[in-house]
Amino acid sequence: MADINSKLEIGVTTGPIRGSRKIHVESARFPGLTVAMREIQLEPSSGEPPVRVYDTSGPYTDPKVTIDIAAGLPTLRRDWIMARGDVEEYDAREVKPEDNGLKGPDRSAGVPPFPNVVKRPLRAKAGQNVSQMHYARRGIITPEMEYVAIRENLGRKQAKEAMIRDGQDWGASIPDYVTPEFVRDEVARGRAIIPSNINHPESEPMAIGRNFLVKINANIGNSAVASDVASEVDKMVWSIRWGADTVMDLSTGRNIHDTREWILRNSPVPIGTVPIYQALEKVGGVAEDLTWEVFRDTLIEQAEQGVDYFTIHAGVRLPYIPLAAKRMTGIVSRGGSIMAKWCLAHHKESFLYENFDEITEIMKAYDVAYSLGDGLRPGSIYDANDEAQFAELYTLGELTKRAWEQDVQVMIEGPGHVPMHKIKENMTKQLEACGEAPFYTLGPLVTDIAPGYDHITSGIGAAQIGWYGTAMLCYVTPKEHLGLPDRDDVKVGVVTYKLAAHAADLAKGHPAAQARDDALSKARFEFRWRDQFNLSLDPETAEQYHDQTLPAEGAKTAHFCSMCGPKFCSMKISQEVRDFAAKQNAGIETFVANEAEAEAGMKAMSDKYDEMGRELYIGAGGREHD
């Protein structure tokens, strides 16, 4: 496949993240099952153990794996799926010209369709249900559940021993240790999902639920005016390198089908889509021409390819559309506006709502999870928490129960633009209306005044709602509201949201969350610069900023940085105070009990300070820099 790769000119970033190595933890329950993790190596002189962190990068950071984009990734889950005996191969539907869009410029940039398309996808045998929820409700612990349990337990043993548990969990049930049985129970209750289409065996199982680590999603995809297949594959690999737990392909231009195939065959994380986008392309971009038959065909097409979760805006009902008329910014969801336009044009109830049970039948045949879309989410803080938003939310709760009746996994999408004082209400109402199904929110953005910085305005809201219980945060890039993000924007968005998710885990009291913070803080206090870089969310940027002012190699062992310099470094001063105190107390077995002796000691040290010229550092020189 090397010749094909060179012709395709699809380049992706591979190799270990700096200062880290890929490790694999073996399962005791399922022979041969190993879970990939990242281990950050610390300076040997520190005497500190390596720090293990959650790894979403898949084989791309494993130096032992040869990456061949034209061949796709290894099919990790194929044997697990086949061993259950409830699936069958069948002839896939024929790819039609309209599957790749009928309007707009070609976005292939010379990249042909994926060369190794599976002609015979899998589906459930007649009368079978292959969803992880179905297995969980029958008491079955699948390899996927075992994988999740091992993956989620990062550092928990050490954290428990060190008694690092602090925070406010707002009623969550975060265990000290995640067992496969706990994972099974959470999935059975509907409080967590494991997005895992049987036609995406390349994916590494992960869980989305408020009793697990907070996850993040990165959006990619072409548009009618920008990007191409190669760029979107590169952005997918780039986003998971920096920590995206799932990726949504939101392509709206030409070559939608081919772009998605390339992404799926090379993605180790779950892939989500909004099928109405492709359905709209199939009818030439005219919302009024959409039909249930076109949409149904699109669902099957994408399920056969391996899409793990569908955003479906079934809560945008005809009676709710007038509620948005009084808004400042109306309906801002693309999917929501498409369905609103269809409903008004035909003056009929949404065909997504009317055919919801049939959609669910398709979902359970492939184990596609619902991501019930918030088509009436607020697009400005003026519209936050209004009647339209919450009317849709309660309908999503109704639909959740209907999906659960067929053992189909569900998560709920949320806003949007919400000021900080209104965020908690969103979480409270979602838990109440949707039976604790995982909440998946875009931000929310807490103010509308910062175009170009909306990764920050939304990161603030994301950290807050993640603390309250949101299970997955959809990233926002600096280009939000302005344009299609490039790979640099993708990285900024992912790192910002990894920060928000981690802050939420800390605030909730996640048992393993603080280990990395403590390791970095200790490295900072001990001036282990390389360890500080490597323990950070973005080692490259951390070192780049350090080297802009102190580029010399020796500066990476210096006990100061350019912010304060050697004389005013608070941590250096603290170390000297600590060392001095240790020397003074060497050999003393008990504290001084006599108050007079203590006072005399204090005066002696004060006199000594006067004799030395009142300098914090002996031999530090004069006061020319005051």
Curated annotation (Swiss-Prot):
Pathway noted in the entry: Cofactor biosynthesis; thiamine diphosphate biosynthesis
GO MF, one example: carbon-carbon lyase activity
Cofactor comment text: Binds 1 [4Fe-4S] cluster per subunit. The cluster is coordinated with 3 cysteines and an exchangeable S-adenosyl-L-methionine.
Binding site for Zn(2+): 417, 481
Cofactor: [4Fe-4S] cluster
Cleavable signal peptide: none
Region (Disordered): 92-117
EC number: 4.1.99.17
Binding positions for substrate per the UniProt entry: 219, 248, 277, 313, 333-335, 374-377, 413, 440
Gene Ontology biological process terms, A to Z: thiamine biosynthetic process; thiamine diphosphate biosynthetic process
Catalysed reaction, written as an equation: 5-amino-1-(5-phospho-beta-D-ribosyl)imidazole + S-adenosyl-L-methionine = 4-amino-2-methyl-5-(phosphooxymethyl)pyrimidine + CO + 5'-deoxyadenosine + formate + L-methionine + 3 H(+)
Top EC group: lyase
InterPro entries, sorted: ThiC (IPR037509), ThiC-associated_dom (IPR025747), ThiC/Bza_core_dom (IPR038521), ThiC/BzaA/B (IPR002817)
UniProt KW keywords: 4Fe-4S, Iron, Iron-sulfur, Lyase, Metal-binding, S-adenosyl-L-methionine, Thiamine biosynthesis, Zinc
Cellular component aspect of the GO annotation: cytosol
Metal-binding listed as a keyword: yes
HAMAP family hit by this protein: ThiC
Family statement drawn from the similarity comment of this UniProt entry: Belongs to the ThiC family.
Function (record text): Catalyzes the synthesis of the hydroxymethylpyrimidine phosphate (HMP-P) moiety of thiamine from aminoimidazole ribotide (AIR) in a radical S-adenosyl-L-methionine (SAM)-dependent reaction.
Name of the protein described by the UniProt record: Phosphomethylpyrimidine synthase
Species name: Novosphingobium aromaticivorans (strain ATCC 700278 / DSM 12444 / CCUG 56034 / CIP 105152 / NBRC 16084 / F199)
